Structures are given as C-alpha cells and as structure tokens.
Curated annotation (Swiss-Prot):
One of its GO terms (cellular component) is plasma membrane. It is found in: Cell membrane. Keywords: Amino-acid transport, ATP-binding, Cell membrane, Membrane, Nucleotide-binding, Translocase, Transport. It is a peripheral membrane protein. Part of the ABC transporter complex MetNIQ involved in methionine import. Responsible for energy coupling to the transport system. The complex is composed of two ATP-binding proteins (MetN), two transmembrane proteins (MetI) and a solute-binding protein (MetQ). Residues 9-245 form the ABC transporter domain. This is Methionine import ATP-binding protein MetN. Belongs to the ABC transporter superfamily. Methionine importer (TC 3.A.1.24) family. It comes from the Bacteria. It comes from Lacticaseibacillus paracasei (strain ATCC 334 / BCRC 17002 / CCUG 31169 / CIP 107868 / KCTC 3260 / NRRL B-441). CDD domains: ABC_MetN_methionine_transporter.
Length: 350
C-alpha cells in the first residue's frame, strides 16, 4: 500500500429522476482509494454501492461532484479518451457474462481482438489463464465449468488490458462460502503479485474481513463510516457498522446463547456481564489472571473468539466479572488502561 491516491471522488452525487419521483442513489460522497489498496465498500442492497463505484469508470455519470482516476479528471475526457482510460480499470460482476458458444480461451481473448496479433493474443491468454489457475480449461466451454471457475474466467478477461484498478461488484454473491473464499484469495494474490488496486463491493462483511485493508460502510446513498479495517472492526462508530461486524463475528448469536445460561440468569448484585474487545498487544496480556491476582476479581469466560486482521490479533470475550463492587470497578479500570474496550451487555439489552 502507498499514499498515492488512484481514485478520488469528491462530493459525488447521483440522482435518478422518474415521472413521479426522484431517487438520490449517491448522496455527496467523498472517497479516496490509494494505490495497492483492497478497499471494501459494504452495505445492504439498495445502499448505493454499485452506483457509486460505477462513477469511477463513468458507467454511471454523476449528477454532481468530481471523479479523478489515475491522475485523470474523468468528467473532462472526450469519448475517445474515456475509452482509453477505461482500459486501465477492469471490472467483474456477480453474473459472469460469458459467451457460451466460445471456449474459455476465446472468452478471455475477446477484449484483445483487433489490438494484438493472433500469436500475441494466444500468449497473453495463456498467461492470464495461468494467473487464475485455469490453464487446463482453455479449450472447455462455460457450461463445463463451476461457478467459481466461471468467475475466474471473468477475472482473467478483466485483466486482459493490464488494468491498474479492478472493480469487483458483488462478484462472490452468487457463490457458496468455500468458493467465495477461494475467489477472495485469488483477488488478494493478484493484489500482491501485480500491485493491483481493488475496489470490492459487497454486502458480506466476511469478505471485507478476509482480504481488505480499508473499508467504507454505505447506507441510503451515503458513506456513514470508513477507515482502516482494524480500526473500524475494533472501534465502530455507527450502529449499522456494529451490526455488520457482530453478525460477521457471530457475536449476536453468542450473546443470545449466553443470556440463557444459568450463570447469567443468576447474577449477583455486584456481578457484571461484559463484552471485552482487545487488539494487538492487549491480546498478549494475561488479563484474566491479573484481574484475580491483583484485584481479587473472578472472570468467568462464557464466550471467546480471536482472529487475525491485517496480521494483528483481534479478540472478543463475553465474561462475568465477580467480586466486591469496588474491586470489580478497579478491575474494569485496569482493563481500560490496557486498551480493552468494554461494553456492558445488560445495559445494551435493556
């Protein structure tokens, strides 16, 4: 990753006007994507994600604002200049859009027709199929491929013009979880091997968690939160972001299950049911042991989860802290000093 911006959207607005009403699909959005980013844009259906990213290559012209891509003011380009610039921006979709009557090699070669010699095209197609792991499928037809393999063909075709940016518009939405994971791993590999900047549109925070380094959350046409992946996951500011993250981490189900446990139903007057979120160095500390040895507070762990985000440990615990009221409060103060984020679950439930 670098600090060089390759996509800069400023105050981008998109409105659709019908006979009876208007729709504000994108509402004055600012977005900066740096070279080498895998930038996830997540939101529910209808949030405006796809409309927003289609302004990057002007498949959707904005009603207002500016679009700068790879140093070019996209809105100032002539049609011929725009066609040239679009070759620097690849795109893959949920639907594969393959030509069923043509072989896989011919599908990948299609964008190159008329631009290279036959021999050069064959060489390029072979390189692309090798890149996406489909060398042995060059002479197959789309009907003979699985959904994941078809998407790999789509990726190879999108890379035919050697783009610097790849837009993935819900490209894994129609795939099963295992295949989704393999496609995401391929995208991450392409990012690392080719220096490819990727903008990933999805309604699945799990996909963002797996490969993105930055994330923006969209709702009702606006970006309501954005930032470094670890920062957003560890300290979400908006309720929608929290909901996405908790669903991905399965914390909602965990809390529902915990609330039914006898330990929780029979809490003492000074007991506290808490969610502890910790990142990085905090994950390496013997926090539970320290609570008991220094504060005489017992921590009953009802749920625990730790994951690695951007090579950094990120964990959540649901615990009952038991002890004297003042000691429990002192223990909580100690946890906060260790940069542990604390959420009182019973207050949240209330």
């Amino acid at each position: 990753m670098s600090d060089q911006a390759v996509v800069t959207l400023k105050d981008v607005d998109v409105e659709f006007h019908g006979k009876t009403r208007s729709v504000h699909a994108v509402d004055h959005v600012d977005l900066t994507v740096n070279r080498g980013d895998i930038y996830g844009i997540v939101g529910y259906s209808g949030a405006g994600k796809s409309t927003l990213v289609r302004t990057i290559n002007l498949l959707q012209r904005p009603t207002g604002g500016s679009v700068n891509v790879l140093g070019q003011d996209m809105l100032a380009l002539s049609p011929a200049q725009l066609r040239k610039e679009r070759k620097r921006i690849g795109m893959i979709f949920q639907h594969f859009n393959l030509m069923n009557s043509r072989t896989i090699a011919d599908n990948v070669a299609f964008p190159l027709k008329g631009l290279k010699s036959k021999q050069a095209i064959q060489k390029k197609v072979a390189e692309l199929l090798d890149l996406v792991g489909l060398t042995d499928r060059a002479n197959s037809y789309p009907a003979q491929l699985s959904g994941g393999q078809k998407q790999r063909v789509g990726i190879a075709r999108a890379l035919a013009s050697d783009p610097e940016i790849l837009i993935s518009d819900e490209a894994t939405s129609a795939l099963d979880p295992k295949t989704t994971s393999s496609i995401l791993e391929l995208l991450q590999s392409l990012n690392q091997r080719l220096g490819l900047t990727i903008v990933l549109i999805t309604h699945q925070m799990e996909a963002v968690k797996q490969i993105c380094n930055r994330v923006a959350v969209m709702d009702d046409g606006a970006i309501i939160e954005c930032g470094d992946l670890l920062q957003v996951f560890s300290n979400p500011q908006q309720q929608l972001t929290k909901d996405f993250i908790d669903t991905t981490l399965q914390l909602d189900q965990a809390i529902d299950a915990v609330m039914q446990q006898p330990t929780v139903k029979n809490l003492g007057p000074d007991d506290r049911l808490l969610r502890l979120t910790y990142v990085g160095d905090s994950a390496d500390q013997p926090l539970v042991a320290k609570l008991f040895s220094s504060y005489h507070v017992t921590a009953n762990i009802l749920f625990g989860d730790i994951q690695i985000l951007q090579d950094t440990p990120f964990g959540n615990l649901i615990v009952v802290l038991s002890g004297d009221h003042d000691e429990v409060e002192s223990g909580i103060a100690y946890l906060k000093q260790q940069d542990v984020k604390i959420e009182d679950i019973l207050k949240k439930e209330a």
